[in-house]
Amino acid sequence: MAVFKTLTDADMAIFSAGLVAGVDEVGRGPLVGDVVTAAVILDPNRPIAGLNDSKKLTEKRREALFDEICEKALSYHVGRATPSEIDELNILHATMLAMQRAVAGLARTPELVLVDGNRSPAFTHQGLSLTSHSIVKGDGLIASISAASIIAKVTRDREMDALDAAYPQYGFAKHKGYPTKAHFDAIAEHGVFDQYRKSFKPVKALLER
């Protein structure tokens, strides 16, 4: 299938394919917190300049685009899977579940779902089965996936900032829950709490000591 690098080209796809939802995830690698996904249906009549893979944008730019996406999108929804669901299902299946929840929560029914990466779960919306495709590095190629990556990234980063306020000794505002040396040092000193993913090897090893 064609890959569209600009919003103008994506608009053309929307006109031919109907409503297109972009889906992306953030937070598969961290040791703590939910895996967060987002689904976004952009409005071709209200283009958003500067959409890109959220990891390639500054925090200030992501925050500005987050607000613009929320204002201009036809629909968007955040889906998540909790640490307990990640431990029960494994991170891959929990991520697929979170993506399904994001699409199911959209206020509009998309005719096509485009997912960043090389895997796509089966999507339904209000009882209807949806066509979906996965696109490797789609968050840098497809406007709606870029928008979804920004919504998911800003949402999860804000949650890590809130967790940092509650547990400042762990440094979540800096490492966002990822397995850095500073994070390992913090959990070695302070232990883990209920939002940690207990099936992840570093956490599991600590609990088994």
From Swiss-Prot:
This protein's GO CC annotations: cytoplasm; ribonuclease H2 complex
Cofactor annotation remark: Manganese or magnesium. Binds 1 divalent metal ion per monomer in the absence of substrate. May bind a second metal ion after substrate binding.
SUPFAM superfamilies per record: Ribonuclease H-like (SSF53098)
Binding site for a divalent metal cation: D24, E25, D116
GO MF annotation list: manganese ion binding; RNA binding; RNA-DNA hybrid ribonuclease activity
Catalytic reactions on record: Endonucleolytic cleavage to 5'-phosphomonoester
Domain RNase H type-2: 18-209
UniProt xrefs under CDD domains: RNase_HII_bacteria_HII_like
EC number: 3.1.26.4
Keyword set, alphabetical order: Cytoplasm, Endonuclease, Hydrolase, Manganese, Metal-binding, Nuclease
Pfam families in UniProt: RNase_HII (PF01351)
InterPro entries: RNase_HII, RNase_HII/HIII, RNase_HII/HIII_dom, RNaseH-like_sf, RNaseH_sf
Class in the EC hierarchy, top level: hydrolase
Gene3D superfamilies per UniProt: Ribonuclease H-like superfamily/Ribonuclease H
Location(s), subcellular: Cytoplasm
GO terms for biological process, alphabetical: DNA replication, removal of RNA primer; mismatch repair
PANTHER family recorded: RIBONUCLEASE H2 SUBUNIT A, RIBONUCLEASE HII
Family as reported in the entry's similarity comment: Belongs to the RNase HII family.
HAMAP family, alphabetized: RNase_HII_B
Role description: Endonuclease that specifically degrades the RNA of RNA-DNA hybrids.
Name of this protein: Ribonuclease HII
Species assigned in the record: Shewanella sp. (strain MR-4)
Name of the gene encoding the protein in the UniProt record: rnhB
